[in-house]
């Protein structure tokens, strides 16, 4: 059985006749070309390991192939498979189910995740929901205890008797 470093060395030796692209651009994001496809795709916000493996299989690309050695056609296949990910998987695998505005199931990728998350928190603050108030005050939101933990800032310390 080959360990991870041995496997990478084996893959590099196998493909040494081609030039390794160290950065591969997919969905306006630079991904590491030295990693296997299933791990390199996790560099996209909104794509985890399981999602990346499904995207690679949906595109017809070997998930264990090194991303930097893939030809441009296969990289383009990966790009289109990422766009069609919502159609391939069941709704419970998507990261935005029953969107508040549209009611649709979506899978957000890239900067859309950050913008939507920030928008949701601002909406909670605007309607003065309990969670929104906790976010405003910088306190814990999910019901954790706050008597002794979660204290931030510099420690005061105890003054010594003279």
From Swiss-Prot:
<comment type="subunit">
    <text>Part of the 30S ribosomal subunit. Forms a loose heterodimer with protein S19. Forms two bridges to the 50S subunit in the 70S ribosome.</text>
</comment>
<dbReference type="InterPro" id="IPR027437">
    <property type="entry name" value="Rbsml_uS13_C"/>
</dbReference>
<dbReference type="InterPro" id="IPR010979">
    <property type="entry name" value="Ribosomal_uS13-like_H2TH"/>
</dbReference>
<feature type="region of interest" description="Disordered">
    <location>
        <begin position="142"/>
        <end position="162"/>
    </location>
</feature>
<keyword id="KW-0694">RNA-binding</keyword>
<keyword id="KW-0687">Ribonucleoprotein</keyword>
<dbReference type="InterPro" id="IPR019977">
    <property type="entry name" value="Ribosomal_uS13_archaeal"/>
</dbReference>
<comment type="similarity">
    <text>Belongs to the universal ribosomal protein uS13 family.</text>
</comment>
<comment type="function">
    <text>Located at the top of the head of the 30S subunit, it contacts several helices of the 16S rRNA. In the 70S ribosome it contacts the 23S rRNA (bridge B1a) and protein L5 of the 50S subunit (bridge B1b), connecting the 2 subunits; these bridges are implicated in subunit movement.</text>
</comment>
<dbReference type="GO" id="GO:0003735">
    <property type="term" value="F:structural constituent of ribosome"/>
</dbReference>
<dbReference type="GO" id="GO:0006412">
    <property type="term" value="P:translation"/>
</dbReference>
<dbReference type="GO" id="GO:0019843">
    <property type="term" value="F:rRNA binding"/>
</dbReference>
<protein>
    <recommendedName>
        <fullName>Small ribosomal subunit protein uS13</fullName>
    </recommendedName>
</protein>
<dbReference type="Pfam" id="PF00416">
    <property type="entry name" value="Ribosomal_S13"/>
</dbReference>
<dbReference type="InterPro" id="IPR001892">
    <property type="entry name" value="Ribosomal_uS13"/>
</dbReference>
<keyword id="KW-0689">Ribosomal protein</keyword>
<dbReference type="InterPro" id="IPR018269">
    <property type="entry name" value="Ribosomal_uS13_CS"/>
</dbReference>
<keyword id="KW-0699">rRNA-binding</keyword>
<dbReference type="GO" id="GO:0015935">
    <property type="term" value="C:small ribosomal subunit"/>
</dbReference>
<dbReference type="GO" id="GO:0005829">
    <property type="term" value="C:cytosol"/>
</dbReference>
